[in-house]
Amino acid sequence: MKKIFNFSAGPSMLPKQVLNQIQQELYDWNNLGISIMEISHRSLEFMELVHDTKRNLRNLLNIPNSYEILFCHGGARAQFSAIPMNFLRGSADNIDYINTGYWGYLAAIESKKYCHPNIINISSSKNELRYIKPMSEWNISKNSTYIHYCPNETVEGISIDDIPDCFEKKIVIADFSSTLLSRPVNVNNFGMIYAAAQKNMGISGLTVLIIRRSLINNISTVQKIPAILNYRILADSNSMFNTPVTVSWYIANLVFKWLQDQGGLDKIAEYNKKKSNLLYHAIDSNDFYYNNIHSLNRSRMNIPFFLKKEKLNSLFLSESTSFGLHGLKGHKVIGGMRASLYNAMTLEGVQKLVNFMNFFSKKYG
């Protein structure tokens, strides 16, 4: 079978070791004689899996006991609605939404159904390079109920790696869908972290929420929030208010164990840095390609790049696919190409992409 490398923004590659284990256990999970796809979510065996999954995630991120872990449906988009519904005290609340790019903006727009958010645009362009403005130019509200932001924008490939100083003593809610588990994160800096699983944690269908318990305790179970989106109800039911996506939970746990086997998030971060440095160097050292993000704000997970000869875009995509490189088409909003280097992408895969880019530029340059 031909070796394929999937650079899609999500669903992404899974580690080979995880795929092999899924294959081995597909018909007989945990020596029960039935598949994980068939087992009851109320069974003792599945409940053990739930506890193991939470424990492994808690260990990976050093999540303190003062935080609850929830496993939810609906992707990150469901949380765009759930967050204001759960945390707003009234429609007059001051809410800050940091507009870092495509996903940060969509979250802010969705919140308008429930409040009047202060949308803070923090990216700008100079000399054809997009960058994040200095924090002194961010118009943060003094008494905001919470601040929402997306630290890594998959579409534009722009990133805020460190938590901004201006967020200190604020309730910070962050969409970590494309970067959670790609590097260490100090959970204590956040009121809530949420992330869809299909990038660095497994397959689609699962969204992980890490929420400070004190925030959950302030939510009423009788508030006018759909029960399936009410964090208090989800916490009280151990994320099983309705039948969960059992397979997604199972695969997430396999990925958590794989990450531990790689040496944890410090080692993963080092490896991800090597991968992204390799690709950025290939782009910057070849006049055939370019990236439009300032070097200080470049994403390590999602790397857009453009051909200076745009008429060759379709040819690049077709030939790269034949080369075993899939999912390189850029997002429809910005075009060009995009290589997503999530945890399961190997250095071998990135090197193969670089080799193809060099080959293509020599052939058509």
Swiss-Prot record:
Q: Whose protein is this, by species?
A: Blochmanniella floridana
Where does the protein principally reside? cytoplasm
Which protein are we looking at?
Answer: Phosphoserine aminotransferase
Q: Where found in the cell? A: Cytoplasm
| Pathway(s) where this gene product acts | Amino-acid biosynthesis; L-serine biosynthesis; L-serine from 3-phospho-D-glycerate: step 2/3; Cofactor biosynthesis; pyridoxine 5'-phosphate biosynthesis; pyridoxine 5'-phosphate from D-erythrose 4-phosphate: step 3/5
| PROSITE patterns reported in the protein's UniProt record | AA_TRANSFER_CLASS_5
> Does the UniProt entry include the keyword Cytoplasm?
yes
Binding positions for pyridoxal 5'-phosphate?
A76, R77, W103, T154, D175, Q198, N242, T243
Q: What is its EC number?
A: 2.6.1.52
For the protein in the UniProt heading, the enzyme class is transferase
Q: Name one GO molecular function term.
A: O-phospho-L-serine:2-oxoglutarate aminotransferase activity
Q: Which UniProt keywords apply?
A: Amino-acid biosynthesis, Aminotransferase, Cytoplasm, Pyridoxal phosphate, Pyridoxine biosynthesis, Serine biosynthesis, Transferase
Q: Which family does it belong to?
A: Belongs to the class-V pyridoxal-phosphate-dependent aminotransferase family. SerC subfamily.
One Pfam family this chain carries?
Aminotran_5
Keyword Transferase carried by entry: yes
- Please name the GO terms of the biological process aspect recorded for this protein, alphabetically: L-serine biosynthetic process; pyridoxine biosynthetic process
The protein's required cofactor(s) are namely: pyridoxal 5'-phosphate
The UniProt annotation places L-glutamate binding at: R42
The organism's superkingdom is given as Bacteria
Q: How is the cofactor bound?
A: Binds 1 pyridoxal phosphate per subunit.
Q: Name one GO cellular component term.
A: cytoplasm
Q: Which residues carry this modification: N6-(pyridoxal phosphate)lysine?
A: K199
